[in-house]
Every structure is written in structure tokens, then in C-alpha cells.
């Protein structure tokens, strides 16, 4: 089990301890920092909904360092990002691969960032199935539907032609921050917090 740092803050009633992620949540910062799967997605969705309820007009900041994961779990986070009222700024720290890259480019237009030495990767969905031939065919058709859906979402957020997206996602496609910016996955490359604050003005 990984160690989570504890932050202790003074209050009028003494001291209060927070785990580091809860403390950052107070600043409207959410971390997507592991494989995207159902349990993790439920936690991220809950945090997004909580921050909307707390202040629907104040921006949310999502920091992404993820290798990707389960498509349906990622789409649950993505749909919630689009559903809530606050703008969601996204920032890639380390990597945003597979579903992680969709969450990155699904942030508010003009508020999608990458740190200078991060990497971003897009590709088509994959899966393996076993069972009766008819069931395998059903799952294969569903995978193709998901592939088309993801292509359409990337096309929407990058403003690239659908055919170009389809070609770009045929295999693992790794990009530097500069390449990701040119592709339309991010809007700016940040080397310091001051640069982000300057762009926000």
C-alpha cells in the first residue's frame, strides 16, 4: 500500500490533518494519477460533482499523470467534465496516454496544458474476448462502435478531420508536448506556474 503524505494545518480549534489529496481538493485541484478504472473513476466523478456543488462558477484544475485504462471508466470522467458547470482546466504531468489523453484534450478550450517533458499518446481501443463465436462477434462490434466514438471525440476537441484522426490512431502514437499542441490535444506548454497565471489573465 502506497504512503500518502499528511498535511497538518492550524485551526481555531487546534490542528487539523488532511491527506495531501484532500488538501489539494480544497484548492479545487483533482489528481488523475493512476490507471483509469471503475473505482478510481467513481472517486474522480465524485470530486468533480462536489466541487461543482461547492461553487459552480469557479474553475477546477485536473492534473493528469496516467497510462490510460478502461474506456468506459474514462468516459464516465469525460462525460462528467462536460456535464458540470465549472470550467475544467487540464494539465499533463508525466504522461497522458490512451484514455488519459482524451481527458487531457477534453478540458476547457484554451485551458489544456502540458509540462515541457511530458508525453502524450493516442491509439485505438483494444480488447480480448473468449466464449461462443456469436458472443465474440458481439464484443467485436461493440469495440468498433467505441473506436468510432473515440475518433469523433478526438476530432471534436482537436478540430482535426475525422479521417486524419482515424489514421493517427491506428497504432500507438506518442507525441511530445510540442507535437501534441500542433495536433490540438493541448493549447499551451507550461514551464512555470507564473506562465499559467499570465495566460489566465
From Swiss-Prot:
Matches recorded under Pfam families: CLP_protease
EC class: hydrolase
EC number, as in UniProt: 3.4.21.92
Stated role: Cleaves peptides in various proteins in a process that requires ATP hydrolysis. Has a chymotrypsin-like activity. Plays a major role in the degradation of misfolded proteins.
Keyword annotations: Cytoplasm, Hydrolase, Protease, Serine protease
Membrane spanning stretches: none
An individual GO BP term: protein quality control for misfolded or incompletely synthesized proteins
Family classification: Belongs to the peptidase S14 family.
Protein name (database record): ATP-dependent Clp protease proteolytic subunit
Record-linked HAMAP family: ClpP
Entry annotation: catalytic residues: 98 (nucleophile), 123
Subunit text: Fourteen ClpP subunits assemble into 2 heptameric rings which stack back to back to give a disk-like structure with a central cavity, resembling the structure of eukaryotic proteasomes.
Compartment list: Cytoplasm
Any one of the GO CC terms: endopeptidase Clp complex
A GO MF label: ATP-dependent peptidase activity
Gene it is expressed from: clpP
Family matches, as InterPro entries: ClpP (IPR001907), ClpP/crotonase-like_dom_sf (IPR029045), ClpP/TepA (IPR023562), ClpP_His_AS (IPR033135), ClpP_Ser_AS (IPR018215)
Catalytic activity: Hydrolysis of proteins to small peptides in the presence of ATP and magnesium. alpha-casein is the usual test substrate. In the absence of ATP, only oligopeptides shorter than five residues are hydrolyzed (such as succinyl-Leu-Tyr-|-NHMec, and Leu-Tyr-Leu-|-Tyr-Trp, in which cleavage of the -Tyr-|-Leu- and -Tyr-|-Trp bonds also occurs)
Amino acid at each position: 500500500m502506497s504512503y500518502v503524505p499528511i498535511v497538518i494545518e492550524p485551526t481555531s480549534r487546534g490542528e487539523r490533518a488532511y491527506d495531501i489529496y484532500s488538501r489539494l481538493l480544497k484548492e479545487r485541484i483533482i489528481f488523475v494519477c493512476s490507471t483509469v478504472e471503475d473505482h478510481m473513476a467513481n472517486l474522480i466523478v465524485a470530486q468533480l460533482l462536489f466541487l461543482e456543488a461547492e461553487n459552480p462558477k469557479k474553475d477546477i484544475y485536473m492534473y493528469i499523470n496516467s497510462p490510460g485504462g478502461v474506456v468506459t471508466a474514462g468516459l464516465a470522467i469525460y462525460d462528467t467534465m462536460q456535464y458540470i458547470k465549472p470550467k475544467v482546466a487540464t494539465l499533463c504531468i508525466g504522461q497522458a496516454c490512451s484514455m488519459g489523453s482524451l481527458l487531457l484534450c477534453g478540458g476547457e478550450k484554451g485551458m489544456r496544458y502540458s509540462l515541457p517533458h511530458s508525453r502524450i499518446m493516442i491509439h485505438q481501443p483494444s480488447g480480448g474476448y473468449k466464449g461462443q463465436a456469436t458472443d465474440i462477434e458481439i464484443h467485436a462490434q461493440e469495440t468498433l462502435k467505441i473506436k468510432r466514438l473515440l475518433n469523433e471525440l478526438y476530432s471534436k476537441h482537436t478540430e482535426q478531420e475525422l479521417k486524419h484522426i482515424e489514421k493517427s490512431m491506428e497504432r500507438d502514437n506518442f507525441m511530445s508536448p510540442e507535437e501534441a499542441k500542433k495536433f490540438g490535444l493541448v493549447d499551451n506548454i507550461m514551464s512555470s506556474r507564473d506562465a499559467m497565471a499570465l495566460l489566465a489573465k
